[in-house]
Amino acid sequence: TTMINNIGENVISPNYVSMAEAATSFASGTGPLARYCDAIGVSGEAAALAEARSGWQDLMSAVQAIEMHPIGPVAENEGFLRHRIHSYASGPLSPCGIDQTAASVDDPGFEITNRSLNQRGVGAIEYLLYEETLQHRCSAGNPVTEVWNDLGETDRKVDRCLAAQLIAEDVAGAATLARDRWSDYLSEFAAESNIGASTQLMTDAFFVLDKLVKDQKLGLPLGINPTCRLITCPDSIESEYSFNSLITVRDNLVAFKRLFSGADGQ
C-alpha cells in the first residue's frame, strides 16, 4: 500500500501537474507560441521562433514523463486522452491532415476537435513549428490545400502558427483534464482493496519502456524491429522535424527510473 501510494501521489501526480502547467503556459495568450505568431513578418521573428521551439521542447519533455505510465483515466477509451496529447504511440502523424488544418484556420466553423488524433497533439505542433519548406504534403488536386503553395511565405507561416495555437489549446485542455482525472482516480488507485490490481497496472506500465521506447522509438527507425520491412525506417522517428528523438528517449529513461524507484528512491 505504501509503495503504490508513494508512486501515485509523489511520482505520477506531479508528472501530470508539470505537464498541465507546461501545456497551459505554452498555449497561453502571452506564451512563447503566441509571441512567435505576433512576431511573424517583423525583425524579431527568428528569435521568437527559437523561443517557441524551446517552449515546445519543454512541453514535450513533460509529456514524455506521463508516457511512461499510460494507466488509469488516460488509458480509457483506447487511450483517447493520452493520444490527444501525443499520438505517436498510436501511429504516425498525418502531415497532409495537419496542412489541411493550417489551410482551414480562417474558415467559419472550423473546429480542431473534429480533426483526427494523428493531426493533433504535440507531434502536430512540432510539424508546424519545425517543417521549413512550408509546402503542403497532400496529393495534387486536394481541394483544401490546392492553393496553399501559391500563398506568400508570411501568409503560410501565419496560418501554420494559428493552427499550432489551436492545437496547443487543445493539448492544454487535454493535459488539464488528465491531471484532474488522475487526481480524482488516485484514491481508487491507492485503496487497499485495489492494491493487487494497481500493482498489476504498474507492472504493465514498466513494459512501456520495452514496447514503446525500445521497440518503437529505437527499433523501428533503426530497422531492428521486424515490423520495419526495409533496412531502416526513418519515417518512424518520433520527432522527425525537430531531431528531438534521442532527447525524448532520455526523458523516458529519467521518468522510468523515478517511477521504478519511487519518490526519493522509496
What is the predicted function of each stretch?
Residues 1-266:
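Mature extracytoplasmic or organellar-lumen-exposed domains after removal of signal/transit peptides
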